[in-house]
Structures are given as structure tokens and as C-alpha cells.
Amino acid sequence: MNPVSIASPKHLLPAMASLGLGLFTCSVQADFISDSKARIEMRNHYINRDFRQANAAQSKAEEWAQGFTARIESGYTEGTLGFGLDALGELGLKLDSSPDRRGTGLLPFGPNSHEPADEFSELGLTGKLRLSKSVLKIGTLQPLLPVATYNDTRLLGSTFQGGLLTSQEISGLTVNAGRLTEANLRDSSSNDDIGYGAARSDHFDFAGASYAFSPQLSLSYYYGKLEQIYRQHYLGLLHTQPLGGGFSLRSDLRYFDSRGDGAERAGRIDNRNFNSMFSLIKGPHKISATWQQLSGDSAFPFLNGGDPYVVNLVTYNTYTRAEEDSWQLRYDYDFAAMGLPGLTFMTRYTDGRHVKAGTVDNGRETERDTDITYVIQSGPLKDLNIRWRNVTFRSGNGLTTDLDENRLILGYTLALW
């Protein structure tokens, strides 16, 4: 595989599209169209964030917006080497906001005027090639990997430009490798050079694999390098143990080792991150406990436009500051057991301590989250998803801002074919 091709998806996409059209017109029996599918994902998102400290730059951030995401996924042309083409279109519309209420992450705003945009959008294409049980995708990507995870917590999902090869030739083994060159943030219409913080890089290379030894046990390893910024190793283990009496214990262990690379454009990177989650499950009940421990001189690094793959990634905070130790207690319940299918409840409390950030040497931050979600089960609004999210975030020793937050999210997916 030519690494230059992965780094230049914009140049390859027109050629791949022309190739796909030629292959399709030459083969009326091709599955390019018959195996295709399309859907529109609609999300209505309201956020009210009330800053609680007296010296806050804003008294509150409050925005309301409507998002549309259209996904078209083709099948593959016939033959040993199959070709396909996917398309992604995203549109965000402002329903309510203002310069003094900006900054929820729903809408982009002007750097000087601070005026939220009335709309923003993105169109992405992804060419794909399939050989046996291996697929190469080049173009617009939304990866879900430990070292590169796209963000989908606001109106529109973030995207990356690059190439991704996924192979499942061996039963139980999934191998991923690729290169990302640009990122489009969740509240942006433009692709920018990939980076971390204010530092930019030419590319992010990654490779790794996950192997399922059994339905109950899997092990993963990934490596990622953001050129001239940082290098990162990841090791993860997932295990589910039946305990009898309808109980099971799920263990999720993750370890990252992150160091600087080359010129270290983002400054010195030195971080070890061990995090774990243990969940006891019985019927509709799930009780979880986590522990996340960071060591080293820097915060845990992750790509702009992405999320950190950590167990204490919660509604508002990530708990990934330098030297931070954090724990979480969480409870989930599915009301289907009480004859109310579609209704679920989640509440959790997360506590982080010993933070080093700027002039703060022993900072603390806590967050309490509650989610209530209902999916309508029948009628004309069947499958409409309604979620209320409530957040209380507090910090100590001058670490950061305090806030109370409510989010109301309505989601619906319409299958076109």
C-alpha cells in the first residue's frame, strides 16, 4: 500500500469515483446499487449551561440547534476486487443562540464578533475497495479506535480525512491500520491539519489489532504516532465472567503510554494512563465502578476532533489532566423489566484529584450526571429517541469553572432504502 495515496485522499477520490462508475456501467449484475443503503439521522439539541462562580466570563451558555446527517453507503461491484463509494452530508442549523450565550459546542462562532453561525455543513466522500475479508477506505472517516475516536456528542459528528485498512481474514482477529491527515471538528465546516491542542502535524499513523479468544475474552493492542508531536501505545482487555444466579461481571482494562515525538510541537508529552471499569450486571440492573490513574509530566494526549478512549469520559469532563487520579460509581437501569420498554435510566458520580495544571498543583474536579432516555415504541413517532441529560460539575483549588447543565436531545433516523 502506497502511504502517499493514503495521505492524499482528495486527489484519489475523483479517480476512484470514475473507476466505480466505469465498473458499474460495465456490469449490470453488480451489487453496487442493489446492496446500497441510505438514511438520514436527525438530531435536535438544546444545551443550557449555567456558570456558577462569581467571576465567570459568561453567566451562561445556551444554544438550540437542529442537525441533519445523511449517509449513503453503496454495495460493492462484482469480482474479486470490489469497489464502492460512500457519501456523508452534514448540516447544522441555528434555532437559538447569541454572542453572549455561545460556546456550548453546538455551533461555530466568529472569532471577533462571537456571533454564532446560522448554519454550517460538510460533504464527504469515501472510496472503498474490498478483497476477501479486507476493506480499504480512503476519504472521509469516522474511526472508533482506541488511538483515534471521532466525537459525536453534539449536533454533528466530527470527521477525519485519510485512509483506513480493516482486515478480518483470520477468525476472531480484526486488524486496523491507516493514516489521518485532516480533522473537521464537531462545530466546524472546514478540514484543518490534524493536531493536538494548538500544534499541527502532517499526519497521524496508526496500526493495531483486536483478538477475541472467546465471546467472553478479547485483547487489543494499538500504536499511534502524531508526527512531530506524540507517540502512543495502547493495551486493552475485555472480559465477561458469568457468576451464577443471573449475575455477570464485566471487566474493561485499558493502558496508554504516551511520549513526545520528534520536534514535540505541543511541548513535552510524558503520560501513562491506566484506567479500568468493573460492571456487575443482573437483569435490568448494572452497577459499575471505575479507577483512572494518570502519571507523568503532561496531560493525556488525543487528537483534535476526537475523544479520549478512557472510562471516565463523562458528559462534560474527561479527567485526563496531568497526574490526575479519578474514580466513578455508576448505576444503569432498564425499565423494560417493569413493563416500560424503551425507558432507561443512568446516574453516576465521578471524582478527580491531585491535578497538576498551570499554577494549580493539587486540583480537584467532580461531576454528577443523570440521563433519562425514552425510545417511542409504536405509532407515527416510533423510534423517536428523547434524552434528558443533567450535569453538576464542580472544581477545587482554582482549577477551572463550576457549572450546572441541562441538555435535551431528540433523535430520529429515517431509512431511505
What kind of feature is each model-predicted range?
Residues 93, 173-196, 246-322, 326, ...:
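Outer-membrane beta-barrel translocator/channel fold
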Residues 34, 62-68, 119-123, 157-161, ...:
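Residues that define the transmembrane beta-barrel architecture of outer-membrane proteins
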Residues 207, 329, 370-376, 402-417:
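Outer-membrane beta-barrel "beta-signal"
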Residues 31-48, 79-87, 173:
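Transmembrane beta-strand segments of Gram-negative outer membrane beta-barrel proteins
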Residues 72-104, 113-192, 209-213, 293-295:
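Outer membrane beta-barrel
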Residues 42-46, 136-150, 175-179, 207, ...:
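Transmembrane beta-strand segments that form the barrel wall of outer-membrane beta-barrel proteins
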Residues 38, 79-83, 133-137, 172-176, ...:
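Repeated loop/turn-to-beta-strand initiation elements of outer-membrane beta-barrel proteins
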Residues 30-32, 74-76, 128-131, 167-169, ...:
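Residue-level signature of outer-membrane beta-barrel architecture
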